[in-house]
Curated annotation (Swiss-Prot):
Tree of life domain: Bacteria
Subunit annotation: Component of the lipopolysaccharide transport and assembly complex. Interacts with LptE and LptA.
UniProt subcellular location: Cell outer membrane
Region (Disordered): 52-85
PANTHER family named in the record: LPS-ASSEMBLY PROTEIN (PTHR30189), LPS-ASSEMBLY PROTEIN LPTD (PTHR30189:SF1)
Function: Together with LptE, is involved in the assembly of lipopolysaccharide (LPS) at the surface of the outer membrane.
Family: Belongs to the LptD family.
Presence of keyword 4Fe-4S: no
Species of provenance: Pseudomonas putida (strain ATCC 700007 / DSM 6899 / JCM 31910 / BCRC 17059 / LMG 24140 / F1)
Pfam family, one: LptD_N
Signal peptide positions (record): 1-33
Protein's name in the database: LPS-assembly protein LptD
Signal as UniProt keyword: yes
GO cellular component labels: cell outer membrane; transporter complex
Amino acid sequence: MALKSPAFRRKFPLLVTGGLLALQPLATSYVVAAEQFDCQVSAAGGWDCKPKTPVNNLPPRPVHEGAAVSSGTEAAGEAETADRPVLVTEAKGRGLKSRSEDYSHLDWVPREKLTAAQLAETGPYCGGAYIEPTRPGMADTTPKDESPTYINAKVSKYQQEQQVATLAGDVVMRQGSMQAEADEANLYQAENRGELKGNVKIRDNGSLVVGDEAQIQLDTGEAQVDNAEYVMHKSHIRGSALYAKRGENAIIRLKDGTYTTCEPGSNAWQLKGNNITLNPATGFGTATNVTLRVKDFPVFYTPYIYFPIDDRRQSGFLPPSFSTSSDTGFMLVTPYYFNLAPNYDATLYPRYMAKRGLLMEGEFRYLTPSSEGQFGGAYLNDKNDDRKDQTDYKDQRWMVNWQHKGGLDERLMTEVDYTDISDPFYFQDLESDQIGVESRDFLNQQGALTYRGDSYTARLNVHAYEAATISQITPYDRLPQITLNGVLPYQPGGLNFAYETEAARFERDLKNDTVFDKDGNLDLTAGPDGRRLDENIQGIERANGTRLNVAPSISYPMTASYGFLTPKLKYAYTQYDLDLDSKGKADAIALQTANPDAYGSYDSSVSRDVPIFSVDSGLYFDRNTSLFGNNYRQTLEPRMFYLYVPYKDQKDIPLFDTGETLFSYDSLFRDNRFSGTDRIGDENKLSLGVTTRWIEDNGFERQNFSIGQAYYFKDRKVQLPGIDYRTRKDAQSDVSPYALVYNYYFNRDWRFNSDFNWDPDSRSTRSGSAMFHYQPEDNPNKIVNLGYRYRNDTIAYDSTTGTWKVGGGDYGTPGDPNYIKDYYKIQQHDFSVIWPIVPQWNVIARWQHDYNRNRTLEAMGGFEYDNCCWKLRLINRYWIDYDDFSQALPQNEKGDHGVFLQIVLKGLGGVVGNKVESFLDQGIQGYREREDQAY
């Protein structure tokens, strides 16, 4: 129990515990034990203590090692030199072993002594962790000026005239959450000040400061520790200083201090600065005149640095990054983060590029109870003139971006994804540090409003595209698109009534000017006389128009525990109002005359109505079985799907948003082989399939296998523009390819996924893939991916000829300089691995090869060193880069090579090599999961 001092004596609230009474004026100057007295607050505000029992003489005060001896002799001088404490500056960034061989004075606990819970929070390559010992008052949040002070010691002496108490032997003082420990202490009552000597430790809320001597202000908690070492347990941070000052607000200031996240026995890296400030309240630190030292060797200097000491956000400079490339030359990025409020922030990315100048980029992020999003922008006055003569290039380069998701209420949702750029080469020449901004051929400029009712969904969508390439044709914009889809809220007689409705306006502004390459010459690679690729679009495919589609349906689902049967009737009606330019009208007449079976004619108003009838059915069987000594429940799930869609001539309808889907097991049970609304495939087929699964008692699905085939009773006449079904063997075949899917999960770490489609007519593989993935759940550092894919039935639009290509397809036509046979055919393997070879060393590799064109798409190899406080990656990489210097896709495919170095100082962030993260994340499956769980 502790006694609190009277209000007018609060300035020095020392309390008596079961240890020693320190500050009561005593009649004698010799040492007495606190247990021998009963103490009460006197009327004068002091302590009134009376002995319980007679006082016995206590043994003399012990003499501690390192105590001062009389000077004046050589022996005394030698002893003084020998007993001089080792300075922290002599440790060169390591912990002082003179204080403890095992660094236990820093609360360091070796890995083998950690509990299971502590190991789970410790990095796999860390030799231990800083564990704060449990002590009284750790969670005390009482303000210092209201907290009593508890003191324990073995012996004490009080000098009444000087009002000085001397404590010796395991001295412990505690006030609130703060605790001070020492071998000896002098407490000055009049000044509320204490002097601590020998093995000094000051603890407070996850921090520890260790030193030889300390001055402490007892009423505020301010302290100065000489020859200090410090630890911040949760952040794995330690360091040292000639002296460390702890303020009343718990801020730690270090003179000639160091900062590192390395283990006590390692000096792999450290920050060394004249003045270092660590603020646990904000989670950040600052330092001036700072050198970054590796193995105590200075490698980098900055007059000022602002760095995190935990995972909280705070305004300040983020770690800079620098790199070099042929496009930019030397590049330096010095991000500055603005922590404006808990729910919004901003980041500025000044990017200096030796070949291009200074690019200013920034982003603003926000979060509200019902929405989230970000604004971003960038600007560069580009001084590089490599593209100055190329069409569409602008030297005043900019980018703006807005991403938003939110809800105006629980039913009404809003969405914005808008990016605009100055020229189509922006992302090819420049990078972006903004989160969520991706480089792609066409950038979204989309806004949507969605309302979700109880049985329906209504959506207003405006979706345009901004071209980030000149090697693709201009796509259609939806300006706007309105949809209403739902079901009737009641089911009379068990019937389900559903509906799909859409009204959309499709527009695009086709370009018809000439194109010049970067040398100022006409680009003859993809069009006649240097014309745009848009000039290759022919006939009614050049039309703009409005589309109205209504598709009500009625179904009668019958379900039971052993199976299901669902007949369904759907009626699709579509109305088009079209506009076509003069070139399109002339092309349409010529094409329709030359090949009336593949091309249609132009009509400003076109309609189409198609009934769709289907019957979907399936059964469910299961049994208990065993496999390789394990018990399973095996299922057998046969499925039969009949589809009838009569033929409707649709050659007069342009393609606004429609393509043909690739064949797979799932496609056997779809009611349309086309995506989008502009084509509804005629069908009279019966699809048969069966799936079997092996399920363990705990619900884990060990493996599954599916096989199926469709039987056709009529040829499929509806095709994409320019394709005559009589030239496609697969459109006239009586059966589809066999579709197989097999997945095996060895456990939760290993999995194998495959699909295989075999054509019985040609007795050849139509498509297939196999992918093996290994990543242990308890050790995600190990990754192995091995895959192969083959596809000989791709369907693609060739922008150089303005025609659709099926069955692989060539690029261009024979005789053209850019002609490539089977350009769209896919035959590739992909292998990637991240694997530990010895402790802390991992090998990283990837090889992606295109057998169709006998070329390597990407190859990289290197190593990673990872320990408790820093990480290094060195990777040699070759890849196919795409840079639009012409309109012909193959001409823009250039092999590139680079050696990439990444250094991460844990606790500071990446120093160099941030680009390494992006290509590892995109190229190696499982890499992101690995990094998310990394220490």
